[in-house]
């Protein structure tokens, strides 16, 4: 009798297989927990292949449901399977299903098994199991054969619940899974009888013929799967056999999808990126007709018009006439001749070379008026420097223009050095960002040209001196520069005009000399001190005389 156990809290499903099919497993408990059956109940259905029972554990409220398979009925099914040669394994299993549950559809069988496992135990009389049932269960879980109990039931193997559920879940695997399951069950039954069926994993014993039954096709399918290295189980498939169903599904999906969409999605031609409409360089473009383009005549230089207006005018007229003649020839002939264009270009180049070889001494300098105007605004030293630079440039120009060797080698070495020195001086004097007041009356000694009042405020100077007369030490205080006296910045703000005073910024270097005011304050202070001491001496002398 095969026992099927379903535990609510703990379900042990050991799928240890040696033949490659779903094998029997038994639910075993630890050694410390001895199952005690209190009023076991069973329900026996007449003519049924399965017998259910219930076990209760007093230590906890956990209940165990057991389903037994009648070995006698199952042996009869197997005998009928071996005797009948016209029916296959699927038909035998359908007949057993009809005899057990009297149902007509395969779906009803699955629902009945689920209901059988999950229902509550009913009240029924069930005899107590023998005391060595726990040891027998442990032996059966370890793989040893168990003896038959008092009721004729044996727990030689426990079929996992998942096997029963998966056995009826997919009809497409009915031929393979049912055959494997029935073959695994038949192995246990034949072990009890002392005989062994022949299969791929169990070779026939000596002196016996191999098993030939109606399930030859099922065994053939199973052998092909085993040779491919797969594990035949309806819910778990490992090995190479897993690829074929996936590929088959992909092929079916592709057959359902129209071929037009697939062809449109994956074109056969190579991928061409977008070509952006960027203007390409002229030399990258290769014209279809490789003909030289018409070159326009070169424009004459404006410098030539300034230097020699008469020759420039003649040259411009010649260029206009040559271009007009060239245009007329092109329009009249209807085609372009490159020899005429090249000859005209050569003539223009020759004329320009001739005009460039004019003696530089005869050419007037167009920048002379501008240079004179700039020189008048600068100091005499700058005028001298400008004249020196112009002489150097004239010497270089004359030497290069004439093409003679009048200038010696040491002069060539000396002239660049002088030019570099002059450029450095001009950079230091003109380009330094120093805040200045560009005026001819910037210094105090420029008062002789009546520019003193443009910078300094005369009323403010007189007011400052009057205050110092009433307080004589202020003369000496203003005459000292530095931390002990008054800084140049504060002194300039005291005596300068309003227009210059608002532009003063602290921290900048001003080119204004206020030393004259400091000297004036020192002299006036000394005079005042002498006058004070003289008046004091005169007072003491007059008093002594009167006494």
UniProtKB/Swiss-Prot annotation:
Q: Where is the composition biased (Low complexity)?
A: 15-28
Q: Which residues lie on this side of the membrane: Extracellular?
A: 1-460, 543-547
Q: Where is the composition biased (Polar residues)?
A: 146-160, 218-232, 326-347
> Can you quote a single GO CC term?
cellular bud tip
Q: Which residues lie on this side of the membrane: Cytoplasmic?
A: 482-521
Q: Which domain of life is it from?
A: Eukaryota
The UniProt record lists the keyword Hydrolase: no
> Which residues bear sugar attachments?
83, 139, 142, 221, 259, 263, 289, 299, 340
Where do Basic and acidic residues bias regions lie?
A: 348-358
User: Transmembrane region positions?
Assistant: 461-481, 522-542
Keywords from the named record:
Cell cycle, Cell membrane, Glycoprotein, Membrane, Phosphoprotein, Transmembrane, Transmembrane helix
Quick one: where's region Disordered? 1-38, 123-160, 194-232, 326-358
Q: What's the protein's topology in the membrane?
A: Multi-pass membrane protein
Q: Which residues carry this modification: Phosphoserine?
A: 112, 189
Which compartment or compartments is the protein found in?
Cell membrane; Bud neck; Bud tip
Q: Which GO terms fall under biological process for this protein?
A: cellular bud site selection
Subunit structure, interactors included: Interacts with RAX1 and RAX2 at the birth scar in budded mother cells.
Q: What else is known?
A: Present with 952 molecules/cell in log phase SD medium.
In the record, the note on similarity to other proteins reads:
Belongs to the BUD8/9 family.
Q: What is the protein's name according to its record?
A: Bud site selection protein 9
Q: Which organism is it from?
A: Saccharomyces cerevisiae (strain ATCC 204508 / S288c)
């Amino acid at each position: 009798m095969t026992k099927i156990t379903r535990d609510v809290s703990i379900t042990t499903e050991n799928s240890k297989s040696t033949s490659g099919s779903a094998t029997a497993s038994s639910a075993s408990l630890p050694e410390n927990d001895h199952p005690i059956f209190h009023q076991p109940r069973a329900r026996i259905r007449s003519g049924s292949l399965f017998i259910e029972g219930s076990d209760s554990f007093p230590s906890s409220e956990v209940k165990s449901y057991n389903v037994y398979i009648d070995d006698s009925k199952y042996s009869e099914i197997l005998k009928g399977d071996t005797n009948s040669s016209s029916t296959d394994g699927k038909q035998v299993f359908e007949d057993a299903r009809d005899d057990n549950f009297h149902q007509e559809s395969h779906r009803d069988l699955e629902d009945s098994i689920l209901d059988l496992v999950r229902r509550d135990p009913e009240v029924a009389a069930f005899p107590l199991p023998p005391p060595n049932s726990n040891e027998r269960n442990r032996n059966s879980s370890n793989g040893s054969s168990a003896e038959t109990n008092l009721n004729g039931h044996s727990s030689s193997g426990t079929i996992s619940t998942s096997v029963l559920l998966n056995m009826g879940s997919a009809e497409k695997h009915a031929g393979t899974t049912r055959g494997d399951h029935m073959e695994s069950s038949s192995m246990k039954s034949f072990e009890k009888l002392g005989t062994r069926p022949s299969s791929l994993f169990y070779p026939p014993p000596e002196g016996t013929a191999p098993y030939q039954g109606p399930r030859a096709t099922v065994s053939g399918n199973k052998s092909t799967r085993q040779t491919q290295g797969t594990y035949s189980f309806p819910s778990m498939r490992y090995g190479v056999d897993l690829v074929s169903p996936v590929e088959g599904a992909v092929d079916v999906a592709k057959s359902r999808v129209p071929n037009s969409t697939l062809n449109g999605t994956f074109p056969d031609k190579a991928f061409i990126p977008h070509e952006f409409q960027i203007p390409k360089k002229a030399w990258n473009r290769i014209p279809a007709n490789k003909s030289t383009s018409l070159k326009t005549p070169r424009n004459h230089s404006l410098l030539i018009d300034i230097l020699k207006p008469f020759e420039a005018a003649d040259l411009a007229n010649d260029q206009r006439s040559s271009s007009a003649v060239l245009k007329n020839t092109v329009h009249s002939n209807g085609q372009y001749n490159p020899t005429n264009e090249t000859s005209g270009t050569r003539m223009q180049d020759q004329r320009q070379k001739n005009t460039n070889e004019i003696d530089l001494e005869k050419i007037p300098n167009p920048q002379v008026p501008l240079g004179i105007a700039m020189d008048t605004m600068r100091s005499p030293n700058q005028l001298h420097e400008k004249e020196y630079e112009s002489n150097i440039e004239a010497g270089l120009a004359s030497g290069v223009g004439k093409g003679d060797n009048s200038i010696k080698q040491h002069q060539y070495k000396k002239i660049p050095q002088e030019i570099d020195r002059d450029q450095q001086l001009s950079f230091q004097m003109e380009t330094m960002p120093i805040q200045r007041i560009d005026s001819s009356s910037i210094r105090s000694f420029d008062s002789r040209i009546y520019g003193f009042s443009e910078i300094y405020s005369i009323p403010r100077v007189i007011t400052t001196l009057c205050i110092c007369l009433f307080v004589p030490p202020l003369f000496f205080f203003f005459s000292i520069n530095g931390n002990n006296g008054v800084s140049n910045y504060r002194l300039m703000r005291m005596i300068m005009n309003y227009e210059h005073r608002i532009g003063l910024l602290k921290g900048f270097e001003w080119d204004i000399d206020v030393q004259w005011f400091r000297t004036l304050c020192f002299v006036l202070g000394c005079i005042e001190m002498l006058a004070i001491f003289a008046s004091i001496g005169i007072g003491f002398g007059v008093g002594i005389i009167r006494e």
